[in-house]
Structure formats: structure tokens, C-alpha cells
């Protein structure tokens, strides 16, 4: 049977080869010339075409004035100031859920008087795609989840009683999830468009929305018990599927953190973090790091992070965010050990 199959394949190959070697050059039996068509493409020599998820990202706060897009920096090699927005591939807005959704059914991107609306319109005018991360945890910051969600009965922790607006919502709470689902659906109605949106940073839980220090216990934000691993996996699966359901045309990303979804913020990588990253990817996500260039072994970009990037390299896009950048001294004298050149 194997010899018969080999013979058939060989015969098919020889037949194809003999056809390919025909003396007929396409001119027909009389050997006439084939009429040609001259094509003259209309080239656009001025507009820059950016590949998706390539290039530099311009960070913009949701409370900035649109004039921020006119910010210039001096480039020594050019010997002149240049407008940063002209060299950016995306505009990254990391902001609060409460800013984007101040009241139930009200959205800042629909309010012409809001700064968010004005920033979005300016970015679109500049043809600068937007990226969002929506932060819900109020620790270190303030009222990140809208008050109407808590008024409806959503559970929360308050780890800093002297700052009553710094509430931490419980992401497994059904009331929280109901309002968050409504918000994500509305966000997608406006921004599920690759012409205007570069990517959505679709997790946003934990401190600063970075995916670590995620609390599941309203009495103790650092509590870890026998149910923690199950709950954090269920929450990550819920939120990534939620974004994937509504954002079908733009990339979704998640921070590949060593303690992703865990109540802690640093230390040895959690044994389940790798599988959580894989779960997010299976739900349609790409990955990004918030700590690129930070070489601290407990919370920076170290062995575990490099291994995750190597594992998924060439399989999904990987976005890097440079960690804190020095401003008071030279990069090359920084303890982080940046390499020059």
C-alpha cells in the first residue's frame, strides 16, 4: 500500500512538472503576444502607516487638556523640538471606572463637556488610536469604582479608614459584576473599532490596575485561604471572556505578572500565574508587562517574566511598558543598570 501511494504521488509530481515545462509561453497556438495592461498606483507619499501594536505609546491622563497632544520635546539628533504625538502609534489612557462612568448609564465619552470626550475627539482628529486601562481598586488613589455601584449593594473593603473613598471592590461579587458588564458593553459600542482603538488593557483589577494585590476578602485585602486560587481563576476567566465578548475587532491585553490575580504584590511567582496567563490567552488575549526594565528580583522584570515572554514569543503580540524612568540623573548612572547603546 505504501509503495502504491508513493507511486501515485511521484506520478502526480511528474505530471505537474511536465505541465510546468511546456514550451507554450501563453501566446496561444500561433505564438502571438499577450496584450499587457499598464498599472499606475496612486501613491500616498505623506501619510505614515503604522503597523498595529508597533511603535511608541503616548501616555495621557484622563484629566489632561487636549492641548497636551501639542507637547514637544527636544531631540538632540535632529537639533530641534518635535511634537510627541507625531511619533506615537497610540494614545494610552489609564483611568478610573468612575471617570468614564460617573453615573449609571452615563458615559464620559458621550459628554461633550467632559475632558475624556475632548481627549478622544482630539486623538481621532490626529488619527492617533486610543488604548484604555480601566482601574477599579481605590487603594492609593481614590474613588475608582463609581459610587452608584456601592449604593446598589456591591461589597467592598476599606483598608485605609482615614480615606473613605479608597474602596476596594470584590470582583467576585455579583452586583459588581453586573454593573461592570454593563459598562464594558457600553465601552465596546464606542471603541470596538480598529480605526480609533489600538488595544484594550482588559483586566484592570488590583492596585493601580496592574493585576497584583487583587482582594477577595472584604475584611482583609491581603487574606489568602483555601478558596483563593479557585476564586481568582474564576474572576480572571469571567473578566477576560467579558472583554472578548464585546471587543471583537481590537486586541486585548493583560499584564503578565508573577502574582497575577493574587492578593500579594511581589515575591516568588505564584505556581498558578503561568496557567492564568495561558487562560487569558486562550480567551483571546495578548500580553504586556508593566515592569520592563525594572530589574528588582521581587517585583521587577526578572527570570519568571522573561520565561513567559519567551514562551509566547511569535505566538501572541507582546507589549512592553518601561518601568519608572529616572529624571534627576543620567540613565547610565541609574541603579537599574540600563545598558547604553
Please provide the spans of the model-predicted regions.
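Aromatic-lined substrate-binding rim segments of carbohydrate-active enzymes
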Residues: 78-161, 232-250
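The substrate-binding groove and active-site-proximal loops of carbohydrate-active enzymes
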Residues: 97-112, 163-179, 221-232
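Active-site groove signature of glycoside hydrolases
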Residues: 155-222
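Catalytic-core regions of glycoside hydrolase
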Residues: 36-75, 87, 124, 128, ...
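Sec-dependent bacterial lipoprotein signal peptides
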Residues: 1-19
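Bacterial Sec-dependent N-terminal signal peptides
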Residues: 14-38
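Short, charge-rich amphipathic segments
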Residues: 34-47, 110-120, 129, 157-175
Amino acid at each position: 500500500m505504501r509503495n502504491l501511494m508513493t507511486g501515485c504521488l511521484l506520478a502526480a509530481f511528474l505530471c505537474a512538472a511536465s505541465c510546468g515545462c511546456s514550451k507554450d509561453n501563453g501566446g496561444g497556438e500561433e505564438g502571438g503576444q499577450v496584450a499587457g495592461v499598464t498599472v499606475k498606483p496612486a501613491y500616498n507619499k505623506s501619510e505614515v502607516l503604522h503597523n498595529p501594536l508597533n511603535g511608541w505609546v503616548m501616555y495621557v491622563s484622563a484629566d489632561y487638556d487636549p492641548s497636551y497632544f501639542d507637547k514637544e520635546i527636544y531631540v538632540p539628533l535632529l537639533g530641534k523640538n518635535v511634537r510627541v504625538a507625531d511619533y506615537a502609534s497610540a494614545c494610552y489612557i489609564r483611568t478610573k471606572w468612575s471617570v468614564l462612568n460617573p453615573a449609571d448609564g452615563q458615559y464620559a465619552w458621550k459628554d461633550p463637556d467632559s475632558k475624556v470626550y475632548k481627549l478622544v475627539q482630539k486623538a481621532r482628529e490626529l488619527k492617533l488610536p486610543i488604548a484604555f486601562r480601566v482601574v477599579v481598586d481605590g487603594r492609593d488613589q481614590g474613588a475608582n469604582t463609581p459610587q452608584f455601584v456601592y449604593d446598589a449593594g456591591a461589597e467592598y473593603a476599606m483598608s485605609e479608614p482615614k480615606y473613605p473613598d479608597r474602596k476596594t471592590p470584590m470582583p467576585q461579587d455579583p452586583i459588581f459584576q453586573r454593573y461592570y458588564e454593563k459598562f464594558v458593553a457600553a465601552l465596546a459600542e464606542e471603541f470596538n473599532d480598529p480605526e480609533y482603538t489600538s488595544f484594550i488593557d482588559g483586566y484592570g483589577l488590583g492596585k493601580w490596575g496592574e493585576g497584583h494585590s487583587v482582594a477577595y476578602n472584604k475584611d482583609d485585602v491581603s487574606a489568602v485561604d483555601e478558596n483563593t486560587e479557585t476564586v481568582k481563576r474564576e474572576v480572571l476567566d469571567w473578566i477576560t471572556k467579558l472583554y472578548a465578548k464585546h471587543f471583537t475587532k481590537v486586541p486585548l491585553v493583560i499584564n503578565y505578572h508573577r502574582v497575577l490575580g493574587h492578593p500579594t504584590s511581589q515575591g516568588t511567582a505564584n505556581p498558578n500565574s503561568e496557567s492564568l496567563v495561558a487562560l487569558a490567552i486562550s480567551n483571546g488575549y495578548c500580553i504586556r508587562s508593566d515592569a520592563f526594565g525594572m530589574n528588582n528580583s521581587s517585583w521587577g522584570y526578572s527570570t519568571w517574566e522573561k520565561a513567559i515572554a519567551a514562551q509566547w514569543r511569535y505566538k501572541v503580540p507582546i507589549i512592553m511598558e518601561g518601568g519608572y524612568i529616572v529624571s534627576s540623573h543620567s540613565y547610565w548612572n541609574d541603579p537599574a543598570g540600563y545598558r547604553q547603546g
